[in-house]
């Protein structure tokens, strides 16, 4: 009799994905972030479900319902802060996962990469709508500013914004629909993640060398299951340190003030994980130009495979490209820092330079450097 693990219609899918999956023998800890993202997603769905049981999506009671969760619900405070800081951990894992893909040339799997980009956009949309729900000052004004960007679209812009708002300003209708979308999107993300994995398992994982590893495969379990469990333990340790010792470290104090349409906060800024894109948006004095740059700052990932000019897939043996990659990382840190600063000299100039550098590295310097490295190989 065959093992039920290999014969049962449902269990064999799990078996072929997480147990008997042939995996390259040399994938490093940078390959842990896929499983960590899965854990983050499950954690967010579970904590979000329990929060939704006590939250009310109404402008008059939303803020006090969040306070009620923290004060009166059993362990409500830990659920709320795990959800809020879980989003930060989610984005840390996302950025590292995308960075790994760029460094080791994982974008050469086009289907997996493109679904990954769709996932990134969906997660960003979900996080943005979730930030609006507590209905604090930064929730309200963040929603107003970001949705208002759509008015830059010629001809239909204003109508589009009012359609999204469900009125002439961010109000009860906006909050209700944002709650509905914030609830449904994680399940769409879950479905997309399954498709992401499906395409990945068609080709098999990439590895640090960027060369085929068919001749040297090992079973996923126990080798990588134990490695993933270690990653999960470290992730949970970091999350719980954040939640239990400084839960508001990454939040904005303005969000502890109930939303007031008559009083604008001095500095409107999104959560830290959107700051790099926010800086690129602010760096262009023209509204439509800023919006296009904002979208393109993420969408640029979609054309990365077309810009791959190197004869080698991975950057492991390409020191010049490595220098550019780490310059890009430093540039993203700079953009993130500038996004949290007021719009004044010298921050405007630094932000503009960092924005130009971001696009220059990805569109011009990296492909050009790869060609130089190809020629150096001939020596």
From Swiss-Prot:
Pfam families linked: Cytochrom_B_C, Cytochrome_B
Positions of heme b b566 binding: 97, 196
CDD domains xref list: cytochrome_b_C, Cytochrome_b_N
Positions annotated to bind a ubiquinone: 201
Keyword Lipid biosynthesis assigned: no
Cofactor binding note of this UniProt entry: Binds 2 heme b groups non-covalently.
GO terms for biological process, alphabetical: mitochondrial electron transport, ubiquinol to cytochrome c
KW Metal-binding (keyword) present: yes
Highest taxon in the source lineage: Eukaryota
UniProt binding sites for heme b b562: 83, 182
Principal location: mitochondrion
Subunit description: The cytochrome bc1 complex contains 11 subunits: 3 respiratory subunits (MT-CYB, CYC1 and UQCRFS1), 2 core proteins (UQCRC1 and UQCRC2) and 6 low-molecular weight proteins (UQCRH/QCR6, UQCRB/QCR7, UQCRQ/QCR8, UQCR10/QCR9, UQCR11/QCR10 and a cleavage product of UQCRFS1). This cytochrome bc1 complex then forms a dimer.
Listed name of the protein: Cytochrome b
Gene name for this UniProt entry: MT-CYB
């Amino acid at each position: 009799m065959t093992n039920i693990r290999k014969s049962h219609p449902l269990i064999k899918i799990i078996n072929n994905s997480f147990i008997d999956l042939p995996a390259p023998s040399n994938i490093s800890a940078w390959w842990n972030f896929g499983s960590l993202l899965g854990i983050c997603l499950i954690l967010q769905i579970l904590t979000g479900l329990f929060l939704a049981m006590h939250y009310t999506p109404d402008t008059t009671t939303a803020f006090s319902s969040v306070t009620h969760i923290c004060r009166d619900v059993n362990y409500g405070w830990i659920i709320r802060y795990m959800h809020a800081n879980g989003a930060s951990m989610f984005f840390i894992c996302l950025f590292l996962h995308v960075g790994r893909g760029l460094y080791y040339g994982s974008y050469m799997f086009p289907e997996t990469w493109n679904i990954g980009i769709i996932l990134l956009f969906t997660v960003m949309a979900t996080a943005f709508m979730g930030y609006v729900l507590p209905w604090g000052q930064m929730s309200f004004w963040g929603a107003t500013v970001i949705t208002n960007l759509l008015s830059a679209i010629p001809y239909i812009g204003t109508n589009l914004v009012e359609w999204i708002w469900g009125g002439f300003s961010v109000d009860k209708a906006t909050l209700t629909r944002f709650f509905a979308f914030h609830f449904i999107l994680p399940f769409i993300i879950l479905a997309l993640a399954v498709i992401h994995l499906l395409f990945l398992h068609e080709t098999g994982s990439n590895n640090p060398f960027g060369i085929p590893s068919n001749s040297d495969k090992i079973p996923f379990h126990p080798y990588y299951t134990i490695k993933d469990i270690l990653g999960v333990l470290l992730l949970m340790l970091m999350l719980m340190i954040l939640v239990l010792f400084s839960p508001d470290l990454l939040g904005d104090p303005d969000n502890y003030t109930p939303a007031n349409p008559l009083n604008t906060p001095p500095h409107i800024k999104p959560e830290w994980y959107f700051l790099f894109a926010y800086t690129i948006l602010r760096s262009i004095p023209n509204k439509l130009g800023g919006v296009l740059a904002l979208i393109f700052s993420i969408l640029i990932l979609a054309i990365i495979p077309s810009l791959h000019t190197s004869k080698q897939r991975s950057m492991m043996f390409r020191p010049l490209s490595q220098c550019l990659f780490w310059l890009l990382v430093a540039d993203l840190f700079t953009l993130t820092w500038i996004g949290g600063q007021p719009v004044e000299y010298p921050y405007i100039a630094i932000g503009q330079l960092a924005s130009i550098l971001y696009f220059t590295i990805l569109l011009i310097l990296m492909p050009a450097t790869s060609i130089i490295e190809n020629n150096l190989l001939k020596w």
